[in-house]
Amino acid sequence: MVGISGRAGPSGSYNYSGHTDNPEPVSGRARDSNSEANSSNSPQVPPPLNAPASPMPAGRPRFLRSMALSSQTREWLEKGMPTEAEAGVPIRLQERAANTAPQARAEERHTQPADAAAPHARAERGRTLQAPASTSPLYTGAVPRANRIVQQLVEAGADLANIRTMFRNMLRGEEMILSRAEQNVFLQHFPDMLPCGIDRNSELAIALREALRRADSQQAARAPARTPPRSSVRTPERSPAPRTATESSSGSNQRSLLGRFAGLMTSNQRRPSSASNASTSQRPVDRNPPRINLMPTGANRVAMRNRGNNEADAALQALAQNGINMEDLRAALEAYIVWLRPIPLDIANALEGVGITPRFDNPEEAKVDNPLMNLSSALKRRLDA
């Protein structure tokens, strides 16, 4: 059922509208859409070229004349139709997307170089913030700084093993002993070392401890092996000679007086050459050893020794004139003195001819001053000269 209802407007006139059984309020948005549809369907005549510009848009008067408006709508239109954003009306999603898409594409074209350079700018900014102002770009990290400290210590002539021990003492807060140059190197990198010590958990301290350990190991590996100091005098080397029956049998007699003289009389033990004498003479020898429990040698003993040597020299000269072979004489004397083997008859007769008895009167007595011993010593000196 269609009915008619009247409502007084702001100017006192009545507005009439038709309604059905299910009345629905007519909103302002619906009226706006209806008015826009009516205005779009009606023919529009373009204004002449010389016509003055109207103070309002062409569609606004038609909208004002299309239907009766409320006082609020009329006031809103007379103020210049503010935008929906200014009036507090939410913007439709389609309009927002349509309006913002061209602007977004334009901004994207303009900002592509900036976005490409953004990672480099962020990296440079992070590097600038991380690097302290006082350090060189080559030694910004803890490990390069630790290697630089070790290099400065080596250039200062420091012993890395000692520095490693002293650095451990610093970290423990114990006493340390450093030279002035070493202390200056540490103060360059640890300014608060003397009053506050060094934090053992800091990154630089850990890196320096590891760098000192590596450098100390490398220095120890490069150092030559320490050998005990050698004597400047070299002992002359003797070629090993085959042991004779005399040497092998006389080994047990070396502790006795007879064995000592037998060792002096053997043919293989000769006096060293002049070169060996020159080398052995360089050794410091105590020419005056302390004499303990020794009786002073009397003048008669010295005279007796000299007389025995003189007699032996004279006897050797006489035997040589008689045609006795000195090597045969030496072998016969050694065999008799060591083994008590009988002296050959021709040599025994020659010895008796020069006044020397060719035998020991009592073999158990001492033979030091016996004429045969003096003759053997003189013969050995003569042959070795």
Curated annotation (Swiss-Prot):
Ubl conjugation as a keyword?
no
Entry's Gene Ontology BP terms: symbiont-mediated perturbation of host programmed cell death
GO CC terms in record: extracellular region
Keywords attached to this Swiss-Prot or TrEMBL record, sorted alphabetically, are: Hypersensitive response elicitation, Secreted, Virulence
Record bears the keyword Secreted = yes
Cite the Pfam families for this sequence.
AvrPtoB_bdg
Q: Where is the composition biased (Polar residues)?
A: 245-256, 265-283
The SS bond pairs are: none
Disordered, as annotated region: 1-61, 73-139, 215-293
Where is the sequence biased in composition, kind Low complexity? 217-234
InterPro entries linked: HopAB_BAK-bd, HopAB_BAK-bd_sf, HopAB_PID
User: Which family would the database say this protein is a member of?
Assistant: Belongs to the HopAB family.
Describe its function: Effector protein involved in gene-for-gene resistance in tomato plants. It is recognized by the host Pto resistance protein and elicits Pto and Prf-dependent hypersensitive response (HR) and programmed cell death (PCD), resulting in host immunity. In susceptible plants, promotes virulence, in part, by enhancing the development of disease symptoms and bacterial growth.
State what protein this is by name. Effector protein hopAB3
Question: Origin organism of this chain?
Answer: Pseudomonas syringae pv. maculicola
Q: What's the name of its gene?
A: hopAB3
